């Protein structure tokens, strides 16, 4: 029997991976070829999707992108056999731009440093046995009986910062919740991934859900919480099914419920589907939504670590952060020497340790997921994602999501350091690691107005700077674009942005200055002509 791997990731399905899987299965039945069709997550290099992999005694081979018209040729070339070794007649395939080879030689993967995405695309997402065989649960089994202070100290040593956008040190949140004198504490995983150009949370939830669940359980055991929640974006239908099934498997395996792994410690995880509002990705608005209230931002202090869900101490981290927890705390040699912790701390930059899961989309040849060390330059990342034959065809990149800054594509910004401190120095944010590349067909005036319209629509309305400021900036911007009192209106726009940055209750208002100021600074000639 030949193992045949095809992704059922949401993005892969949108590229007809499901239809290709059905056609291959039917053709195998017709030819009486015994194949084992295995659905996986996606490697995240979407120009190759639908990607078909076969595994035999010679290894794993990939072919993609496969179209319906290629299916018969694949079978005629005996791809689905034990003797296939990667050599076959490519005459019919090269015309369609099909690539093939051993998965170990897949260059877009080989050059990455995949720590938390190492299983995505390789193993069936809901196979707990495969997860365990690949090192999963080693972190949980190790820390379940360790002193909580030691666990938090190891997270501190690793240098892990939250991957939700703000980059706040993870250990501080956990330590604060641990020290709070409360019988009831909560763990919340923020899976309300709403930024444009961000899709890593969804991909790992669909492709390796056990790594997230393990990280959440570790957090609960460490700080003394009994209940955890995954707050999932309402549009993530496939991820919802995957998470619910994974939670059932964990319950049946004794990883959730009473006496986890016979330790005497209890912890449960529930899934909550979000209300669909962009601002619910902000941690306090998310908590309000979880309490069946309107998703509006809370005043701080107190922070959620002191008064969070139902006013109880709450650890609130995003999906990728919990995945890094599972990685960092596993593979120990003894209590004080952790191979993964040491490696994580050794890569990246001084203030941005480890890897970042960059999500590259737009005008690139190979859009997708690139898990690379913090501090990689923009040029290195763009080259890895396919490169460009003509730099002049590119106009801009936006880094950090909808509220991230726009940068021109030139020699100065090709050397941009992709880290928290590197983006800060250039007046930008790293955010969730989303990078959208624009060519010269993009209308940046339209992008500016669309950003302002989005902020107006998505403001929760609680604070005046955001509610009124975004509307006022749009009015003034429209005047500027009509060449009405340009200097005076630009000055007022700057004053309002400064007010919003200092007085808004959340990032929706406080970070609006990043896209607006960067567009006006770096693309002034286009915006004002």
Identify the residue ranges that each predicted region occupies.
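Accessory "access/gating" subregions that flank catalytic or transport cores
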Residues: 141-181, 341-346, 351, 359, ...
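Fe-S ferredoxin-like electron-transfer domains
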Residues: 59-157, 285, 295-310, 441, ...
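Short acidic, glycine/serine/threonine-rich loops at helix termini
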Residues: 16-18, 48-53, 166-174, 198-201, ...
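Short amphipathic, charge-patterned alpha-helical segments
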Residues: 215-219, 373-391
